[in-house]
Amino acid sequence: MTRPIGIDLFAGAGGLSLGFEQAGFDLVAAVDIDPIHCAAHKFNFPKCATVCKSVVDVTGDELRRIAGIGKRDIDIVIGGAPCQGFSLIGKRALDDSRNQLVHHYVRVVMELKPKYFVFENVKGLTVGKHRQFLKEVIEAFQNGGYDVVTDYRVLNAADYGVPQDRRRLILMGARKGLPLPAYPEPTGRTTVGDAIGDIPDAESFPELWERDWVKAKYGKPSTYAAYLRGKKDDPTDFGYRRQFDPMLLTGSLLTDHTELSRQRFAAIAPDDVEPVSRFKKLALNGICNTLRAGTASDRGAFTSPRPIHPTVPRVITVREAARLHSYPDWFRFHATKWHGFRQIGNSVPPLLARAVGGQIMKALRKKPEKPSEMLALGDQSLIGISMTDAAAMFGVSSTVIARRSRPVDRPAPRRHEERELVTA
């Protein structure tokens, strides 16, 4: 079986990668500048070449060589390039140095000459002065030999089975002469209760003050949760199966709250915002607010604001956030809360990516097939690796990502020990 192939630029931990794999593609290379993200991608995608580099410094020929695909036609290039600024009057926004990552995304697409591309970004690119920048991006693709779906859309992941309000611009294009893809039709909604209702309360396990995993007995899953736990076959998932223990609860390192915080969390009604912390309390029959990545190093490197659990007076865990983002339970994130939430908050929900990938598959006129091969996940050390060790492993500087000015969270000390309390 020969599956269509793709390359993910700005891959992060792999939300787009996973969604397109589930749509029937083989991701042959993934590029990201962050060694921690690259380590997670390497762990979760053992068949994909991980390239820890800025897209500014990579070429199409280099990616072909690393991926081992020679001159084979690439079916899809995907990616969400950050854009930091907009130009003064009289200067093209795409030429602005602050937007060089978008410029180089376009460049690498031109060098690789895939049949299709998908450019994902914030919905803000579609409003006000930002639309001029988006127009320049579209023109750059058109001048490079691509037709673009100019009636671009902002898609809400909640319309594609993700229990989260998350709106993203999806821009799609095809090499001239190939049919343009259509946008996916909504597939229905999933609730918070569907997503996390079967997960046992992390605070029932003292081990989770020291590490992020434990063997646990789960409750009765919804269909959504059964798919993510691997307890039921999802007929729309054409990705590789992974070897993992479905009784393992991962990504569940606990957060210690003051008693006052717990009282406030318990008192607030579902779907309301707790006034002191400004955290939203989730409702079992609702959807989650947008999960974010937290602040950068130059802004204090704070962990992202996390919603309050709907039935327990605490914030949600990384695993609960992953469920709300449509990641399967075999998918692992960094063991620390800061990196784990950063990886989720920076990523495209796999179910949204799968819906888009399915439309590219239709445009290719190919029928997706489920591989029979089951993949072993990577070495466990990749999940707890430090930035210094991750950088050394990939042969890059440990300062390629600005250092966190606050210590990365470590396993929480026992309650009788001195600890940093979350009072927000």
From Swiss-Prot:
Residue span, SAM-dependent MTase C5-type domain: 4-367
Keyword Methyltransferase attributed: yes
GO biological process terms, semicolon-separated: DNA restriction-modification system; methylation
InterPro entries associated with the record: C5-Methyltransferase, C5_DNA_meth_AS, C5_MeTfrase, C5_meth_CS, SAM-dependent_MTases_sf
Catalytic activity: a 2'-deoxycytidine in DNA + S-adenosyl-L-methionine = a 5-methyl-2'-deoxycytidine in DNA + S-adenosyl-L-homocysteine + H(+)
Protein EC: 2.1.1.37
One Gene Ontology molecular-function label: DNA binding
Keywords annotated in UniProt: DNA-binding, Methyltransferase, Restriction system, S-adenosyl-L-methionine, Transferase
Biased composition (Basic and acidic residues): 406-424
Active-site residues (renumbered): 83
Stored SUPFAM superfamilies: S-adenosyl-L-methionine-dependent methyltransferases
Region Disordered, residue ranges: 404-424
Alphabetical list of Pfam families matching this protein: DNA_methylase
Family that this chain belongs to: Belongs to the class I-like SAM-binding methyltransferase superfamily. C5-methyltransferase family.
Function: A methylase that recognizes the double-stranded sequence 5'-CGATCG-3', methylates C-? on both strands and protects the DNA from cleavage by the XorII endonuclease.
Protein name as catalogued: Type II methyltransferase M.XorII
Organism, as annotated: Xanthomonas oryzae pv. oryzae (strain KACC10331 / KXO85)
Lineage of origin: Bacteria, Pseudomonadati, Pseudomonadota, Gammaproteobacteria, Lysobacterales
